[in-house]
Structures are given as structure tokens and as C-alpha cells.
Amino acid sequence: MISVTGMGGIGKTTLVKKVYDDPDVKKHFKACAWVTVSQSCKIEELLKDLAKKLFSEIRRPIPEGMESMCSDKLKMIIKDLLQRKRYLVVFDDVWHMYEWEAVKYALPNSNCCSRIMITTRRSDLAFNSTIESSGKVYNLQPLKEDEAWDLFCRNTFQGDSCPSYLIDICKYILRKCEGLPLAIVAISGVLATKDKRRIDEWDMICRSLGAEIQGNGKLDNFKTVLNLSFNDLPYHLKYCFLYLSIFPQDYLIQRMRLIRLWIAEGFVEAKEGKTKEDVAHDYLKELLNRNLIQVAGTTSDGRVKTLRVHDLLREIIILKSKDQNFASIVKEQSAAWPEKIRRLSVHGTLPYRQQHRSVSQLRSFLMFGVGEYVPLGKLFPSGFKLLSVLDYQDAPLKKFPLAVIDLYHLRYLSLRNTKVKTVPGHIIGKLHNLETLDLKNTSVRELPVDILKLQKLRHVLVYQFKFKGYAQFHSKDGLKAPSEIGNLKALQKLCFVEANQDCGMIIRQLGELSQLRRLGILKLREEDGMAFCLSIERLTNLHALSVTSEGESKVIDLTFLCSPPPFLQRLYLSGRLQELPCWIQSLHSLARLFLKWSCLKYDPLVYLQDLPNLAHLELLQAYDGDTLHFRSGKFKKLKVLGLDKFDGLKEVTVGKDAMTRLEKLSIGRCELLKKVPSGIENLTKLKVLEFFDMPDELMKTICPHGPGKDYGKVLHIPDVYSTYWRDGGWDVYALDTFSRDCSPRSGTLIRSHEPRIQWKV
């Protein structure tokens, strides 16, 4: 048992996360889980979170009925799962002793050298939690002067040294941060935007810190530093920054969700030559550059996927939001609302109706983790006709909310991850200002013709992924859209539309959607290939395209495309290709390319190897040949490569200086492949090598015991796994656990590895 304690922002989570993510640490444990403990968490939810992560880590199905289990039952399941396993569990940001008391009985002490770590702001909790196990308490201290200076300069001057004429000013400002890393990073974000030649600007910042920062309270000092960061924001960014207060603590914010919400709220100013989405991305980039928001996850091609706000930053944002009557956060049923409320974010439980509170000015209503559904009319009996944002994501909703019919000003409607099945035409047709309709992971399969009345609609997401184990051909449910979809001229995202309807009319209509950035098509017929290509040629702003044929053996004919969209970055093709479209070679911006069930007769690598920005390539049953050759000096930017179900593949060769940036290689279900790629030892940047259901004959060639003649070729790769789909879950074995007879499946079962990437636009 190890407890790490210290004030908020001192780096407890950062330190423990660095240890937790270290491959040399993780290889010692069979199961690992990181659980973030929110300030208002419930014990049952905490245990469910721990259980789900553990089952996910060892790739086992989650037990049925877990959502309704009591805490005692959950503890028993977790304890049984971890019994006789060496595990590592981290509880981040524990606030109360009873939280630790509740979960510790679920963690068995089987003398397997397991480790439990907690981070907490409370030193008494840190001490008391370690008494029983004679554990250790690590009281994290502020950075030393030289460490703080190094961090400050790295963030302020992007790795360069501080100019001599600014040293005194910078050291004065740095002293006010008192070694608190979060404060240092925040103020560095402000200073990094300043002209290094204007000493007067820097001196003004130095003087504006004010007398309050000289107090003894470290939180007060940090508030002052953050106020400086906030006050330095351009006017258009202040609302965007305050908007982060609506999300719960430790919530992973989806980048595109935030972008669309900002636009719906009216925070994004239009600029000539740019869409509002482009401008919003510029806003986000500036907040990231100022270190006021953190990247939580990225895609394989380097795009920001999720974001988060440090909890201490969030607390101060909430205070500012409250002071300015910007938004109200409700966490308890009895919580009183302000007299006038503009934005309401409900976390965990719906508030009681407050008859005497006016919501006539309510602009936005969002719910997070709410376990019950109450119709809007009952929740707000006095009316809410000015609502522009209604976010019901993950709500226990079964029917389309009828009250929406009166929301003429509504711009953003999300029913994602609900059980809604239909969209009433007489209701949706009234929402003339709607810009985003998010029905992802619902049961909606058709949009009514009334949708064509929504001329401002920019984003339509109506699809559901169905993944279990290996990718299946029909892994997505899309939607039937009105054949005259081309009337929605403002559309930027349309996913996923079934194309085999109305005699291909919808295919011809797609060319009218000149603003499209992302397009997903299902069930494209071979005979519609020419019409589809003519439409795609007109979509010059397209960044991502996903096309799936009617069936695994059905042909996608894209050979008629002469001028592909010049900015295409992501291309996903599922279905038989008689030949690889030659225009793919001209896609200089292409970063991700997935080819599934292509069954090409000729080696596609020859046509793909010179794509200058290709970072992620996935090939599933894409080629019928027996050899794949990655030529020397080619695929210069490739970072992720997946090869799956090549039925005839017998040999893979990697030339010298090929794929010099490759970090992850996955090879699966290639039954005739009996040895690892020749030249794999040249892939010096490779971090992960994973085999999926590959023959034992291949695995024995890299076995550390016995006849493993190729073991030395993969010795430089930190993580080598052999993975098998068994009984509805993934069994994962590390190379160094293979048994003496070199049978990977008789080795030691370890934690799960990163799940296979989904195919999406």
C-alpha cells in the first residue's frame, strides 16, 4: 500500500501515472486498473468502475446484472477476480476515508506482491489508509528551485533558454508560483504568447500579480495566477473556457462534442474562408497552447480525441462561472437554483422542481450520469422556449422527447447512447434552427422526410457499432435517409447512410452537399459506382470517407473517380476491389487508410508506399498473394500497421530503412505465415508487436526458451503479445511468459492490451 499526498496541483496524479504507465512496471502484474474517485462519488459506482476496468483489462465479459448489484456483491466479484493474481490498482484523488474503507475489502492480500496506490489531498487519509498494511506515505513536496526553473523555461520558451534581460522578471514570477507545477504551467502558458522583445509587457505582467499572491494560502496564490491566465484570454475565448465548468470532475470531453456545443452556444465567430468548426478548432488549439486544458487522448494519426481539465483548474472555473452567472451546476436534488439561470448542468441526480424559479431565460440543459428521466415539461413547468442546447447523452430515455416541438431556437440535440427508436417527423420538422442531431448508438434507423426542412443542419450522426471480437463485415447499423438529402446544403457530417434505396437516387444527391467534411456510406451497389464517383468529385472539402459495399463478396467500383477530394485525410473501404483505385496514390494528405475484404490480386503496398503522410494502415483480407514486401526507404511516416486474415500470406519482408517510425505492428489470423517478418529487427522504434490467433509454429520461433531462433529479432521490442479470442473474451500472453515447451497458451495469462481500433469516419 502506497499513499501519495500533497495539495491540489502539486503533481500527485502525474507522478503516479508515470509509474503506472511504465511498461517495466506493468509487466510485473497480471491485472491493472486506474480508478478516478470524484468528490461526490457513490460507493456502488466506485466499485462498478473498478470491476469494469478489471474485466476489461483481462478481456473477460462483464457479468450480467452488474449495474443493479449491491456493494457487497460487487466486492465479492472483484475479490474473486483478483484472487491469486498479482495486481496493481490505483485510486486517484480519494477525498474521504469511508471510500477507502469500502473498497479495501474487495482487494485480496494473497501474498502475490500486489500493489495498491492512492493519491489524496488529505494527509490524514494518506496516513490512516496505510496503517493496517504497514504501507508507505509519500508526501509530495513543491518543486525545487532548479526543477521549477527548468519546467518554467520549457513551457515559456519552448525549450530555449530564458533571455538574460528577462531573467529577473521571470524569477520573480516563478517565486510566486511556490514550486506548484500546475501554477507554473498555467503562468507559462500566458507568458509564452508574449513578445520576448517587449520588456515592458513582461514587467506589466509581473506587477499585475498583485498583493494577494503574496499571501500564505497556496490555493489563493494559485487562484491569482489563474485569474491572470483568464484575464489574459481574448474575449472570444473566455466564454469557451468558462464552458468547461459544465462537465463533471475528471470527465473526458470528446473534442468534437465540445466544438459543436461551442458553436451552438454562439461562442464561435465566423471568419472569411473558414467554417465555424475551423474557427472553433483554432480556439481549442489556443487554449491548449496556454495550458488551460489538457489532451487526454489522441488518435493514431495524431488528432486530439479527448480533453480534460485538471480538477483544481475546474474548481476555479466553476467559481468564475458562478460569479458571472454563466452556468449552474446541480449535484443534489435539494440544490437551489439561481434566480435567473442560463445554463443548467445536472450531475448524477435530477433536482426537485422549483416552482418559484424562473427558467424562461434557460439556454442550455445538459445531463451527466442521471439515472432517471423526467419530461422537460414537468422539470420546468414555467417553460423553457429559449433553449438552444439539449444534451441527453447517456440518459435513460426510451422515446423521443415530445417537448422538443416547442424549442424553435434549438441548435444542438443529442440523444446519443439512449434507447430512442424513432424520430417523429412532425416534431423534428419544427426545429428550423437545428445544427447538430446526434443519434449515435440509438435504435433509430430512419430519418423522416421532414428532416429536409432543417436548412441549417450541419452534423447528422445516426449509426451504431456492433463489435464483438474480430471485425465483422456488417459491423455498423446506419440509417435510411430521404432521397432528396442534397437539399441540406449546410451538412458537414453525414454518417452512416444506406445507399441501396430509391434506385440510387441518394447517391446522386450527395454531390449537392458541397460543405461535407465527413461522409459514411453503407450498402453501396456496384452499379452505382459511376454515380457515386461523380458525386464524390464535387465534395472538394471532404476530409474523411467511409464506404462499405452490400456484402463481403460485393464489389466497390471507385475506378471512375478522376479528381478525388484534395484534402482527404481518412479513407475506409470495406468490400471487394477489382483493383486498387489509382487515385489513392495522389492523396498527399491521407493519414489513415483501412482496406477490408478487398481481395486484391496485386500487392497494394507498391501503390501506397509513397503516400507522404500515411500514419496508420490497416489491411484485412486485402490481398490474395503470398508475399508482402515493405521496400527500403518507404512508408516514412507510418506509425501503426495492422495485417489481418491474409489467407495465402507466407512471407513478410521489411527492407532496410522501411517504416522507420513504426510504433505498433499487429498481425492476425494469417495461418500460413510461419515466421516473423524478415527484417523486423530494423524497426527500432517499434514499441508493440501483437499477434492475434497466429499459428503456434510462428510463436515458437520467437520463444525465449528452446528453438526460438528469431527471439533475438524481437528482443528490442518492449511489448510482444500473443492474443487469442476465447469464450467471448481476449486471452493475452506476454512473450516472456511463454512456457518451457514454447506454447504461448500454456504461459501466464496477463492483462488485456489496447483494444483493436474501431473502423469509423
Residue positions per predicted region:
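Non-catalytic, charged helical/coil tracts that couple and regulate nucleotide-powered enzyme cores
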Residues: 50, 54-68, 112-114, 120-239, ...
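Surface-exposed helical/coil interface segments that assemble multiprotein signaling complexes
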Residues: 108-111, 163, 190-240, 245-406, ...
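Post-nucleotide-binding-loop coupling segment downstream of the phosphate-binding loop, primarily
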Residues: 2-10, 14-77, 260-262
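A conserved switch/coupling segment of P-loop NTPase cores
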Residues: 18-28, 71-143
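Cross-kingdom leucine-rich repeat
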Residues: 79-82, 87-88, 110-111, 332-342, ...
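Mid-core helix/loop region of P-loop NTP-binding domains shared across ATPases and GTPases
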Residues: 43-49, 59-90, 95, 169-179, ...
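Short, conserved phosphate/pyrophosphate- and ester-handling motifs at nucleotide-, phospho-/glycolipid
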Residues: 12-13, 65, 92, 180, ...
